[in-house]
Amino acid sequence: MGQKWKLYEIKDGKVIRKNKFCPRCGPGVFMADHGDRWACGKCGYTEWKK
């Protein structure tokens, strides 16, 4: 917790998100990239990568 600044980067003066937001929890709750899937640590929602 407390390191959300690592999930953003600035390119050409614009802020770009590195990870996806959780569709259940909404903006502000990032999903973790586990290689074969995206997972939300708050609600447990998981999206499998192809």
UniProtKB/Swiss-Prot annotation:
InterPro entries noted in UniProt: Ribosomal_eS31 (IPR002906), Ribosomal_eS31_arc (IPR022845), Ribosomal_zn-bd (IPR011332)
UniProtKB keywords: Metal-binding, Ribonucleoprotein, Ribosomal protein, Zinc, Zinc-finger
One function term, GO molecular function aspect: zinc ion binding
GO biological process: translation
Keyword Ribosomal protein on entry: yes
Coiled coil: none
Cofactor(s) of this protein: Zn(2+)
Zinc finger (C4-type): 22-43
Cofactor binding description: Binds 1 zinc ion per subunit.
Secretion signal span: none
GO cellular component, one term: ribonucleoprotein complex
SMART domains: Ribosomal_S27 (SM01402)
Binding positions (Zn(2+)): C22, C25, C40, C43
Subunit structure as annotated in this protein's UniProt entry: Part of the 30S ribosomal subunit.
Family recorded in the similarity comment: Belongs to the eukaryotic ribosomal protein eS31 family.
Protein name: Small ribosomal subunit protein eS31
Gene designation per UniProt: rps27ae
